[in-house]
Amino acid sequence: MTAAGGPLVVVGDALLDIDLDGRADRCSAGSAAPVVDVAHRTFRPGGAGLAARLAAADGAEVVLIAGFAADEAAARLRGLLDRHVRVVTLPLRGSTICKQRVRAIGPWAAPNGHTRARQSRRPVLITRIDSGAGRIRADPLPEEAVAVLTTARAVLVSDHGGGAAAHPQIRKLLRAHADHVPTVWDPHPRGPVPVPGAALVTPDHATALTLLSGRLDDGPDLWKLAKGWAVDAIAVTLGTEGALLCLRASGKRLRIPLPSVARAPDGGDTCGAGDSFAVAAAVRLAEGRGPESAVRRAVLAAAEFVGAGGAAAYSETEPVAVREATADWDPLRT
């Protein structure tokens, strides 16, 4: 099942990821919470936006279909995307979803904030602050989006809870072309079920546990889920343990480990590893490979992504004045 020519299409929810990095040399007197003096702010595309950037890294033709709000965060996001991928914009109700991590080094760089931490050379995640609640409207798709989905060589649905995966016309088009266009579905715990005929669904471990009522093993539950969804295969990503693949047609379940020689050093930033996995699988399926081959390549690709520094390669960094960062944590204020 493959479509010759055409772009690789990523359809989903594009987010703006932000890192505030600095030092935590002291704590708050009132609560012993770490006080982070921010040195710089880093922006990068997240969600479907990151997936599209990853897919385009080797020069392939990639089209991103996603919703964009009329706000400063969306403008920043478009600036990170437009030079690298073709973007087809869908109307978004509400504001851009931003996920902001506060990270630090220093003696008080610890998420619990109650004791001095053993200092690490790597930034320690102190907290994450989410903002924005934009959702894609169920308006008719622009003609450009319909044309792109019709001519795609493969589709990756990157569901991050923003409504793209639930859009009725998108789902109808994906179902109509599923027999000759491989579709990889990266699900969200609160998102819709994959469309019937999807070639591969790639939940992470936590999402799989939610779908399977807290149980994930080599038993029949995963196969029953694949049958219920009418998808060709499910691959549960397991981090450094690789992936668990289940094929609907045969009921075969296969654990695909990460080779020890490919294991990334401990402490690497895993943000975006799941997107890397899904992209690699979609590219492999577009080449006409089967799901087992696609998942084996995806396991390696995710490890290589983390080992190479993760999503940092797709970021833009700017310095931040300490007074500004401590006075107001607005992620877009410059």
Which ranges hold each PLM region?
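Short beta-strand/turn micro-motifs composed of small residues
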Residues: 12, 65-69, 187, 238
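Short hydrophobic/aromatic-enriched beta-strand-loop microsegments
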Residues: 64, 87-90, 200-205, 253-258
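Conserved phosphate-binding/catalytic region of the ribokinase-like
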Residues: 132-136, 151, 168-182, 188-197, ...
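Residue-level marker for buried hydrophobic side chains located in beta-strands
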Residues: 8-10, 183, 201, 234
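Conserved beta-alpha-beta core of the PfkB/ribokinase-like small-molecule kinase fold
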Residues: 24-35, 98-139, 149, 153-224, ...
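A short acidic-Thr-Gly-centered motif at the start of a beta-strand
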Residues: 1-4
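Active-site metal-binding loops of divalent metal-dependent hydrolases
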Residues: 13-14, 160, 276
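Conserved N-terminal subdomain of the carbohydrate kinase-like
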Residues: 6-8, 16-156, 313-334
